[in-house]
């Protein structure tokens, strides 16, 4: 049966958890901030169509598209189980800017693999599918990591564990927080953002990082939103990556003065997130970011909430 899966935007790192924390977000106004993938029966083993507002940024060659790679690894896994892959046609609706720090590649990967799995009657379980998603993310960024694909697929705030067969688990967070997401419209490559980081860190930074991350997780589990927000600090990446983001320091300064609880870089940037407790504060911060952080017509600002669902079926037609 034909299926369409939507996969939401995500915040890698959430400042405090470099490479081990991620959060899925969705705009409060119902805008779909994420990619959709449709899978339906086809005449050939595989064919791909593309659509969406950022379709022009995709490779023109089918075999260079990550959705094709998803089909290849999904077929490989089904072959191991003695299951044949159906002839199918996939359509990627690319609604997410590439190199934005919003988990754009994760959106395509999660929507594609989830849709393929559902189209075939879900032969792969959640952990098997998530492992494939991490493998595909690694193909793009150069190393397997789950801090975008896990929240995008499973929803909420996810902590990467990768032990005892557990890839990630959800961290209880605060449903009343507003997450203002501001994408300036420029591109920052994940590879460049990683190269700028030091190969070694000072002991006091390592201690501070451990305190902040442990404190954040503890505050989430014990229901202390003010403490959790105070712990959202990054000594690992943001001090070095700020120089790649024009206007970030000013934006954080304004957001703090306007009443935001915390502001940080989403993933490797250039998108920033700002957490606010009150909607009027979130809207004030959003207006300022639209006027001062967004640099061109491709940029945007959304007031979001945590997306607790992750990837979902939205029907059978795009």
Curated annotation (Swiss-Prot):
Single GO biological process annotation from the record: threonine biosynthetic process
* The reaction(s) this protein catalyses: L-homoserine + ATP = O-phospho-L-homoserine + ADP + H(+)
Localisation per UniProt entry: Cytoplasm
The Gene Ontology terms for molecular function here are: ATP binding; homoserine kinase activity
Print the keywords alphabetically. Answer: Amino-acid biosynthesis, ATP-binding, Cytoplasm, Kinase, Nucleotide-binding, Threonine biosynthesis, Transferase
Which Pfam families does the entry link to? GHMP_kinases_C (PF08544), GHMP_kinases_N (PF00288)
Say if the entry is tagged with keyword 4Fe-4S.
Answer: no
Listed binding positions for ATP are 97-107
Keyword Nucleotide-binding attributed: yes
Q: Which InterPro entries match?
A: GHMP_kinase_C_dom, GHMP_kinase_C_sf, GHMP_kinase_N_dom, GHMP_knse_ATP-bd_CS, Homoserine_kinase, Ribosomal_Su5_D2-typ_SF, Ribsml_uS5_D2-typ_fold_subgr
Q: Which domain of life is it from?
A: Bacteria
Q: Which Gene3D superfamilies match?
A: 3.30.230.10, GHMP kinase, C-terminal domain
GO CC terms for this protein? cytoplasm
Q: By its UniProt entry, which HAMAP family does this protein fall under? A: Homoser_kinase
> In which family does this protein belong, per the annotation?
Belongs to the GHMP kinase family. Homoserine kinase subfamily.
Q: What protein name is recorded for this chain?
A: Homoserine kinase
